């Protein structure tokens, strides 16, 4: 279970292990922070699908769409010193993919500076129909 740091917002994350290939995928589509337990889980995974909902903490209020920040809704924004991009830089997981991306997030715009920042960090941007293959069967 993942808890937001600002208010009582709870989410769920899953770790899935393929016992044939001994590969592991962790799915955390809504996370307000990356604590040590989650960091260890990421480090022990071959692939992580992580919360890519918002680029900035004030994304919706700044667009006049709502009043709550990303973190108030249980989402760690990608940008900023404490954002997920910064925190994921030191996590050595082989494959990192942002999922659960809000339609206001500029990483969805091809060739946007935000998308290029994500790609340059070696993190993939999930899309409809994405297929993930983990490991090779013996």
What is the predicted function of each stretch?
Residues 136-138:
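Short, surface-exposed amphipathic charged segments that create phosphate/polyanion-binding patches used
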Residues 4-13, 20-24, 31-130:
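Cap/insert and terminal regions of metallo-dependent hydrolase folds
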